[in-house]
Curated annotation (Swiss-Prot):
Any Pfam family hit: TSP1_CCN
Positions of disulphide bridges: 48-72, 52-74, 54-75, 61-78, 86-100, 92-114, 209-238, 219-223, 247-252, 268-305, 285-319, 296-335, 299-337
Gene: Ccn6
Phenotypic consequence of gene deletion: Deficient mice are viable and fertile with no obvious abnormalities in size, weight, skeletal development, ossification, or the occurrence of joint disease.
Record's function text: Plays a role in mitochondrial electron transport and mitochondrial respiration.
Keyword Protease in annotation: no
Gene3D superfamilies, alphabetized: Thrombospondin type-1 (TSP1) repeat (2.20.100.10)
Organism of provenance: Mus musculus (Mouse)
Presence of keyword Glycoprotein: yes
The protein's name in its UniProt record: Cellular communication network factor 6
SMART domains xref list: CT (SM00041), IB (SM00121), TSP1 (SM00209)
CTCK domain location: 268-342
Glycosylation sites: 308
C-alpha cells in the first residue's frame, strides 16, 4: 500500500514539472503580442573599411566648407553642410555647429541629415540673426551666424592668372623673381596696403621687449554695452595675449535723437550726454558707481560723428550674491563729425578691391 502511494505521488510531481517546463517555453511574438511572428532585425551597413584607402590628392573644398578627417579616422574630406545627408563616415561640418540628425531614419539610424545645434544668434548692425542663418551685409561677401560668431566668405573668387613659370617643354624656365605674379601685378599695387591688416603695428621699446599692439576691434554692439579686443605683448612676459575692454558707443533708447539738441545756426552736435548719471549693467551685474558717459552726436546733413579722443577707465561691477569684478572700459572724451561715415561694427568698412 505504501509503495502504491509513493508511486502515485512521484508520478503526479513529474507530470506537474513537465507541464511547467512546456508552459515556460519561449514563443516567437511581435511587439503587439502576436505569437508565431519573429522579431525583425535590422543590420546597419558598414561604411568604414580598414585598412584605410585614401585618394592620392586631397579634395578642394568650396569657400566656407571645412576640410576634416572622415568619421572613420582615415581620409580628409569636405565636411557636409546643412541639409546634406550624413552617416558615420560622412560627417557634418563641426566648425559650424552641425550634427547628424538620424531621427528620420528609424529604426535603422543609418543615414541622417546635417542640422544645426541649438545655440545663440548674432547681432550685426542692429539686426539680429538666428544661429545658422546666412545673410549678405556686403555685396562682395556672404556671412553665416554660428553660435554668436559671424564668419564670412567671398562671393566672387578672382581667377588666378596663368603663372609665368609654366613654360612649354623644352623651353627655359622664367627667372624665379618673376614667377607667380600674374597679370594683376598685385605686388605693384599699393591699394591693399591701406587695409588695417597691412598697417604697421605700433611699436615701443620697453626694457628688453619690443611692445606691439594691434588696433582695437570695433565694438561688438552698435548700441548698449559691448566688447572690443586687441592683441598685444605689453605684459611682464612680453607674450602676445588678447586683451578685452568694454565699450559703450550709444544707448539703445529710441529717443536718442530727442536727447541731442543742435544749437541754432549749427548743423551738428558732436557730443551729448544723458540727462542724469546711471549705473552700467553687464552680464546681470551693475557698476558700483553711477556714470554719465559722453556719446557721439548727430548731424542734420549727411555727416556722422565718431569718437576722436578717448581714454581707458576701470569699472567695478557688483553681482547679486556672487561677488564683484573689474573691467577696463573705453571712455569717449570727444567726437568729430565727418563725411566718411561707417557703422561702428562694420567689419567691411576698410575693404579694398585689389
Amino acid at each position: 500500500m505504501r509503495r502504491l502511494l509513493f508511486c502515485t505521488l512521484l508520478m503526479t510531481g513529474l507530470t506537474q514539472l513537465c507541464c511547467r517546463t512546456q508552459g515556460s517555453a519561449p514563443q516567437d511574438s511581435t511587439p503587439g503580442g502576436r505569437p508565431g511572428a519573429a522579431l525583425e532585425v535590422y543590420q546597419r551597413t558598414e561604411v568604414c573599411r580598414w585598412p584605410c584607402r585614401c585618394p592620392p590628392q586631397r579634395p578642394t573644398c568650396p569657400p566656407g566648407v571645412s576640410l576634416v578627417r572622415d568619421g572613420c579616422g582615415c581620409c580628409k574630406v569636405c565636411a557636409k553642410q546643412p541639409g546634406d545627408t550624413c552617416n558615420e563616415a560622412e560627417i557634418c561640418d563641426p566648425h559650424k555647429g552641425l550634427y547628424c540628425d538620424y531621427s528620420g531614419d528609424t529604426p535603422r539610424y543609418e543615414t541622417g541629415v546635417c542640422a544645426y545645434l541649438v545655440a545663440v544668434g548674432c547681432e550685426f548692425n542692429r539686426v539680429y540673426y538666428q544661429n545658422g542663418q546666412v545673410f549678405q551685409p556686403h555685396p562682395l561677401f556672404s556671412c553665416l551666424c554660428v553660435s554668436g560668431a559671424i564668419g564670412c566668405t567671398p562671393l566672387f573668387i578672382p581667377k588666378l592668372a596663368g603663372s609665368n613659370c609654366s613654360a612649354a617643354k623644352g623651353r627655359r624656365k622664367t627667372d624665379p623673381p618673376n614667377c607667380g605674379r600674374g597679370t594683376l601685378q598685385q605686388q605693384n599695387s599699393a591699394s591693399y596696403k591701406t587695409m588695417s591688416a597691412y598697417r604697421n603695428l605700433p611699436l615701443t621699446w620697453r626694457k628688453k621687449c619690443l611692445v606691439q599692439a594691434t588696433k582695437w576691434t570695433p565694438c561688438s554692439r552698435t548700441c548698449g554695452m559691448g566688447i572690443s579686443n586687441r592683441v598685444t605683448n605689453d605684459n611682464a612676459n612680453c607674450e602676445m595675449r588678447k586683451e578685452r575692454r568694454l565699450c559703450y558707443i550709444q544707448p539703445c533708447s529710441r529717443n536718442t535723437s530727442q536727447a541731442v539738441k543742435i544749437p541754432r545756426g549749427e548743423t551738428c552736435q558732436p557730443t551729448f550726454q544723458l540727462p542724469k548719471a546711471e549705473k552700467f549693467v553687464f552680464s546681470g551685474c551693475s557698476s558700483t558707481q553711477s556714470y554719465r558717459p559722453t556719446f557721439c552726436g548727430i548731424c542734420l546733413d549727411k555727416r556722422c560723428c565718431v569718437p576722436n579722443k578717448s581714454k581707458m577707465i576701470t569699472v567695478r561691477f557688483d553681482c547679486p550674491s556672487e561677488g564683484s569684478f573689474k573691467w577696463q572700459m573705453l571712455w569717449v572724451t570727444s567726437c568729430v563729425c565727418q563725411r566718411d561715415c561707417r557703422e561702428p561694427g562694420d567689419i567691411f568698412s576698410e575693404l579694398r578691391i585689389l
